[in-house]
Amino acid sequence: MPKLKTRKAAAKRFRQTGTGKFTRRKANRNHLLEHKSTARKNKLSHMAIVDERDEERVSLMLPYL
């Protein structure tokens, strides 16, 4: 059976934790940051866990993680 290809766009966006879950960045922290509060920007800077309903799709895009 041939090797499976990794989706490079997904490989740049997701990381796998030690327990096998996937982490992702939160949206809304790239530009237009002047009017957003410091607390809001700080909360957006932390990594989020990918929802369990999306985990299967992410794992199919990243077969070797």
Curated annotation (Swiss-Prot):
<dbReference type="GO" id="GO:0006412">
    <property type="term" value="P:translation"/>
</dbReference>
<feature type="region of interest" description="Disordered">
    <location>
        <begin position="1"/>
        <end position="28"/>
    </location>
</feature>
<comment type="similarity">
    <text>Belongs to the bacterial ribosomal protein bL35 family.</text>
</comment>
<protein>
    <recommendedName>
        <fullName>Large ribosomal subunit protein bL35</fullName>
    </recommendedName>
</protein>
<dbReference type="InterPro" id="IPR037229">
    <property type="entry name" value="Ribosomal_bL35_sf"/>
</dbReference>
<keyword id="KW-0689">Ribosomal protein</keyword>
<dbReference type="GO" id="GO:0003735">
    <property type="term" value="F:structural constituent of ribosome"/>
</dbReference>
<dbReference type="GO" id="GO:0022625">
    <property type="term" value="C:cytosolic large ribosomal subunit"/>
</dbReference>
<feature type="compositionally biased region" description="Basic residues">
    <location>
        <begin position="1"/>
        <end position="15"/>
    </location>
</feature>
<dbReference type="InterPro" id="IPR021137">
    <property type="entry name" value="Ribosomal_bL35-like"/>
</dbReference>
<dbReference type="InterPro" id="IPR001706">
    <property type="entry name" value="Ribosomal_bL35"/>
</dbReference>
<dbReference type="Pfam" id="PF01632">
    <property type="entry name" value="Ribosomal_L35p"/>
</dbReference>
<dbReference type="InterPro" id="IPR018265">
    <property type="entry name" value="Ribosomal_bL35_CS"/>
</dbReference>
<keyword id="KW-0687">Ribonucleoprotein</keyword>
